[in-house]
């Protein structure tokens, strides 16, 4: 009996040692808040807290006047379609981040998800109010019925479709689709258009600043999503097989086709320096390729670098670290809402 008891104790110690040393992943629940296995989440949370804003900061009064008096009929239609397309995504698609902690049950990951979800609520409210102030609500509702708008919603909601029995791989698939195409691609042609009008026509300054805030935060969300994806790759490389990459690359091609239809509609025939349907399509192709590269996948789009060169001003603004005071149009040294955070800032 003594030998048996000793044997049981030895086996128990070995079993407990195995449990302690057993590799855990981001999919395994962590009940206690400490230690924080993913301290990089704190940098993203801090960046979003430092950039807090609300739509109440803007009156849009001058924008309304400029919209009615300083734009041509063609330009007004472009703005209407562009803001409708932004509002469609912000209002109809964004609910993903609030549930990230249910699938990746770590306190720090859940916190990050809640903070990003709160930012999406701010975006939702901001664009609802902007559409109201500019008296576009009826047009917005009508535009949502258009075939190419519905097609975009359909492809952007593919992340909700189940393709894998393995719950971890299914969530990874959904996370990749949402991060790459909802956060890092779908809204950026619209951001580009609004920023272009403010830059080249000197109009819609409040709208432009709201778009800058949104643009920088969507970029930050994409960086956070890619960090989560790359963490999964480090911990569970077997999930990243050829079949998954092929599926994502196919979805990327479909994303470009859907976005191209939206671009043709939004651009409304405009052909000016730095702004045309052709330029916007090359811009979106490049964002798709960059998104894929951020998670270690190969490119899927052939990009005309000469045309893309005309969009470099947007990229320079996006990666700039200083806030631009849009009343004085000069760099300022304090950190606030429109400050961009890139990988070097965060890690």
Task: Write out the residue ranges for each language-model feature.
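Acidic, Ala/Val/Gly-enriched low-complexity intrinsically disordered segments
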Residues: 6-11
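Non-heme di-metal
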Residues: 15-347
């Amino acid at each position: 009996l003594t030998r048996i008891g000793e044997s049981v104790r030895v086996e128990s110690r070995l079993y407990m040692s195995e449990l302690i040393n057993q590799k855990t992943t981001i999919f395994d629940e962590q009940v206690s808040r400490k230690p924080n296995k993913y301290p990089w989440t704190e940098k993203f949370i801090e960046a979003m807290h430092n950039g807090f804003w609300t739509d109440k900061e803007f009156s849009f009064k001058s924008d309304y006047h400029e919209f009615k008096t300083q734009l041509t009929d063609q330009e007004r239609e472009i703005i209407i379609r562009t803001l409708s397309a932004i509002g469609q995504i912000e209002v109809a698609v964004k609910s993903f981040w609030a549930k990230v902690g249910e699938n990746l049950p770590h306190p720090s990951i859940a916190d990050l998800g809640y903070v990003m979800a709160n930012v999406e609520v701010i975006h939702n409210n901001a664009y609802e109010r902007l559409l109201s102030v500019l008296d576009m609500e009826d047009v917005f509702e009508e535009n949502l019925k258009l075939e190419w708008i519905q097609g975009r919603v359909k492809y952007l909601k593919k992340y909700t479709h189940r393709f894998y029995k393995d719950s971890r791989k299914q969530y990874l698939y959904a996370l990749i689709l949402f991060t790459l195409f909802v956060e890092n691609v779908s809204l950026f042609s619209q951001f580009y258009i609004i920023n272009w009008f403010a830059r080249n026509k000197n109009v819609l300054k409040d709208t432009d600043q709201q778009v800058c805030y949104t643009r920088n935060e969507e970029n930050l969300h994409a960086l956070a999503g890619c960090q989560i994806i790359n963490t999964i790759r480090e911990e569970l490389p077997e999930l990243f097989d050829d079949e998954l990459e092929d599926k994502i690359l196919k979805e990327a091609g479909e994303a470009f086709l859907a976005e191209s239809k939206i671009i043709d509609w939004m651009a409304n025939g405009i052909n000016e320096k730095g702004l045309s349907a052709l330029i916007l399509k090359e811009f979106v192709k490049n964002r798709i390729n960059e998104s894929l590269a951020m998670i270690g996948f190969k490119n899927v789009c052939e990009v005309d670098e000469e045309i893309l060169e005309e969009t470099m001003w947007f990229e320079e603004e996006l990666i700039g670290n200083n806030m631009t005071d849009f009343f004085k149009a000069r760099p300022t040294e304090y950190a606030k809402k429109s400050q961009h955070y890139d990988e070097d800032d965060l890690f």
